[in-house]
UniProtKB/Swiss-Prot annotation:
NCBIfam families: deoB (TIGR01696), PRK05362.1 (NF003766). Keywords: Cytoplasm, Isomerase, Manganese, Metal-binding. The keyword Ribosomal protein does not apply. This is Phosphopentomutase. One of its GO terms (molecular function) is manganese ion binding. GO terms for cellular component: cytosol. The lineage of its organism: Bacteria, Pseudomonadati, Pseudomonadota, Alphaproteobacteria, Hyphomicrobiales. It catalyses: 2-deoxy-alpha-D-ribose 1-phosphate = 2-deoxy-D-ribose 5-phosphate; alpha-D-ribose 1-phosphate = D-ribose 5-phosphate. The gene is deoB. It is found in: Cytoplasm. It is an enzyme of class 5 (isomerase). SUPFAM superfamilies: Alkaline phosphatase-like (SSF53649), DeoB insert domain-like (SSF143856). Its cofactor is Mn(2+). It comes from Methylorubrum populi (strain ATCC BAA-705 / NCIMB 13946 / BJ001) (Methylobacterium populi). GO terms for biological process: 2-deoxyribose 1-phosphate catabolic process; 5-phosphoribose 1-diphosphate biosynthetic process; metabolic compound salvage; nucleotide metabolic process. Mn(2+) 2 binds at residues 305, 310, 358.
Length: 406
């Protein structure tokens, strides 16, 4: 019986979606603009990387051709060699968003139909009733922030005051999110998590997709830095996902990275949450090597987004892509005849773009495995085609959305 490995390269978009102008993102292109910047010498950083973007293994899977399908051009350095080793195409999101839950849920067969709630870019950003309820239920002396902000910038600005006052830093963004940053030692990690659990309940009437705990350490003198103990408190998908179908069929499921958080820990099987892309990929490959027939490993690699996309860090993003590319041979090595690996993304986060937010983009779809077909699968009109294709490959009943490319 076949097995499947689904890898989401968080924010690795390949060109503005057809409706990107509605989001102020027309012309955005995460992979394409990184490749162009590197070709022009703007992706160099001493001690990290230099020169053109080098992704030979992803190019051999059809990434450059997927980019061409999305934008009409192959990014510099991504022209494929022969023979190509995968099915390649690009997918368009049907959900009205450019956030992590919307992208992942649609990949898993459940497009978000009702719009998420968002907070205005004002100060204060949160309704007074919401803030009052959180303060009362969590026993807080108050909150700091209460506005749209970059997570690293607001910690730098308010970290010292937070440590002095005990008030957590609450902020949001263009996504449907309520984020709480607090010092792991001065405030306490468990208290931060409990505050987020309370915030999750307080935010439910506002249709907020995620409450995120953003722990940090450091001091006013030495500076503050985020830690790896972030935790997301998401609402559950409204309908049955690919994961639910796998669970109902009694299949082995392993969720690596923040997958468990994204799906509210429903039907996520064994959860593994290491820190960093390299450790997450290690864990996924180890789990897949031991996976029984019919099993499924679902992996999110978040560092592209959090460490480089939001920070508009072209050299860092390029280096992260190259590091992943170098490990593609390890992925091939764990695949047995009949196994399937799909590499895709959930949205864009163009590090050359204005601001610090996600970008509304199309995503690559690269599907491969020993003995599987190769060639173009064209434009997929919903991310749900990915989940539908994985379900078909694993012999599951059809999902509620999406059309398999098999």
């Amino acid at each position: 019986m076949a097995r499947a490995l689904l890898i989401v390269l968080d924010s690795v978009g390949i060109g503005g979606a057809p409706d990107a102008d509605r989001y102020g993102d027309a012309g955005s292109d995460t992979v394409g603009h990184i490749a162009e910047a590197c070709a022009a010498g703007r992706g160099d950083r001493p001690g990290l990387r230099a020169g053109p973007l080098r992704l030979p293994n992803l190019a051999a899977l059809g990434l450059g051709l997927a980019c061409e399908g999305a934008t009409g051009r192959v990014p510099p350095g991504l022209a494929p060699g022969e023979p190509l080793r995968a099915l390649w195409g690009h997918a368009v999101e049907t959900a009205a968003g450019k956030d992590t839950p919307s992208g992942h849920w649609e990949i898993a067969g459940v497009p978000v139909r009702a719009p998420w709630g968002h907070f205005p870019d004002t100060h204060p950003a949160f309704p007074a009733e919401l803030t009052a309820a959180l303060i009362a239920r969590a026993g807080l002396p108050g909150i700091l922030g209460d506005r749209h902000a970059s997570g690293t910038a607001i910690i730098d600005a308010l970290g010292a005051e937070h440590v002095r006052t005990g008030r957590p830093i609450c902020y949001t963004s263009a996504d449907s999110v309520f984020q709480i940053a607090a010092h792991e030692e001065a405030f306490g990690l468990e208290q931060l998590y409990e505050t987020c659990r309370i915030a999750r309940a307080v935010c439910d009437p506002y249709r907020v997709g995620r409450v995120i705990a953003r722990p940090f350490l450091g001091s006013e003198v030495d500076g503050f830095r985020r830690t790896s103990r972030r935790k997301d408190f998401s609402v559950a998908p409204p309908d049955g996902t690919l994961l639910d179908g796998l669970e109902a069929a009694g299949r082995a499921i392993v969720s690596v990275g923040k997958i468990g958080d994204i799906f509210a820990h429903r039907a996520t099987g064994r959860e593994i949450k290491p820190a960093g892309n390299a450790a997450c990929l290690d864990a996924a490959l180890d789990a897949f090597a031991e996976l029984p027939e019919g099993g499924f490993v679902f992996l999110n690699l978040v560092d592209f987004d959090t460490e480089h996309g939001h920070r508009r860090d072209v050299p860092g993003y390029a280096a992260e892509l190259e590091a992943f590319d170098a490990r593609i041979p390890e992925i091939h090595a764990v695949l047995r005849p009949g196994d399937l690996c799909v590499i895709t993304a959930d949205h864009g986060n163009d590090p050359t773009w204005t601001g610090t937010e996600h970008t509304r983009e199309q995503v690559p779809v690269l599907a491969f495995g020993p003995g599987l077909a190769t060639g173009a699968i064209g434009r997929r009109e919903t991310f749900a085609d990915i989940g539908a294709s994985v379900a078909a490959h694993l012999g599951l009943p059809p999902l509620g959305a999406g059309r398999a490319w098999w």
